């Protein structure tokens, strides 16, 4: 069983990318569980065709500790197993703690069965705060992929996340598997993201082009694989899934300084030198 965490800045398309990749893996016959680690609880919506799944934390609040696995785990597209950890009430408590509680509960209830090929953790976070780092800190997720684009803040967040991974890689077995570029059609985006990936010692594992079919599929509460399996974009997600499935490059990242990141941006024509 490979345990994979997907990180990236808010709004970069982590949940969409994760669900489409998982759908492609499921289509190819892999058995996959997705654990949403975001208080928005939207990490499994497309796999479940819009079902507003009750989160682990809400279930615990309503029913106490004596809950059944069926109460928190739903089956989605391609027999994927879908869980949302949820979060505390706004302004109260730490969402990261919710992730810890949820994963512990899933372990207690026997969700991590031997027949699973993958568990994906879709994790909120521009910065790897202690709670949100839990899937890597506790050694649950062994491989990390960062979703980024060719925009400064996305790459700044990716570099920050690499710092967090480096910290935990030194004491545990977690490794960075690569950067997924979720294109925003920025100038020189492919070359820039590839250069940033290489600078921190990893690879751009796939460049996902921008395509409006992703939004059309989302409006219909589906992944692209489900909505239009013959679409070019569906094939892009299949390529990403295959790249992850066959990946052999797992590294301890070498994060950049802020100055070096800005140097790379300038080199690729993003920031005008003052």
Swiss-Prot record:
The reversible ADP-ribosylation of Arg-97 inactivates the nitrogenase reductase and regulates nitrogenase activity. InterPro entries: NifH/chlL_CS, NifH/frxC, Nitrogenase_Fe_NifH, P-loop_NTPase. Its cofactor is [4Fe-4S] cluster. It catalyses: N2 + 8 reduced [2Fe-2S]-[ferredoxin] + 16 ATP + 16 H2O = H2 + 8 oxidized [2Fe-2S]-[ferredoxin] + 2 NH4(+) + 16 ADP + 16 phosphate + 6 H(+). The modification ADP-ribosylarginine is found at residue 97. SUPFAM superfamilies: P-loop containing nucleoside triphosphate hydrolases. [4Fe-4S] cluster binds at residues 94, 129. Homodimer. HAMAP family: NifH (MF_00533). This is Nitrogenase iron protein. The lineage of its organism: Archaea, Methanobacteriati, Methanobacteriota, Stenosarchaea group, Methanomicrobia. The gene is nifH.
């Amino acid at each position: 069983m490979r345990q994979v965490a997907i990180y990236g800045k808010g709004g970069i398309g982590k949940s969409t990318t994760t669900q489409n990749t998982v759908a492609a893996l499921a289509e190819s016959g892999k058995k996959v569980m997705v654990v949403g680690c975001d208080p928005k609880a939207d990490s499994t919506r497309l796999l479940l065709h819009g079902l507003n799944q009750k989160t682990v934390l809400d279930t615990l609040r309503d029913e106490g500790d004596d809950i059944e696995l069926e109460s928190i785990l739903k089956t989605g597209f391609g027999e994927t197993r879908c869980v949302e950890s949820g979060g505390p009430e706004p302004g109260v408590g730490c969402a990261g703690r919710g992730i810890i509680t949820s994963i512990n509960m899933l372990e207690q209830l026997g969700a991590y069965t031997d027949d699973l090929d993958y568990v994906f953790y879709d994790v909120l976070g521009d910065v790897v705060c202690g709670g949100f780092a839990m899937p890597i800190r506790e050694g649950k997720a062994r491989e990390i992929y960062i979703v980024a684009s060719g925009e400064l803040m996305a790459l700044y967040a990716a570099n920050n996340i690499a710092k967090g991974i480096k910290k935990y890689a030194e004491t545990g077995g977690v490794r960075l598997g690569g950067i997924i570029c979720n294109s925003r059609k920025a100038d020189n985006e492919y070359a820039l993201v590839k250069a940033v990936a290489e600078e921190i010692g990893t690879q751009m594992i796939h460049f996902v082009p921008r395509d409006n079919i992703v939004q059309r599929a989302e409006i219909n509460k589906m992944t692209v694989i489900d909505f239009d399996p013959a679409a070019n974009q569906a094939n892009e997600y299949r390529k990403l899934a295959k790249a992850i499935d066959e990946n052999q490059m797992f590294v301890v990242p070498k994060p950049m300084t802020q100055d070096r990141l800005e140097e790379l941006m300038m080199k690729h024509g993003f920031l005008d030198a003052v």
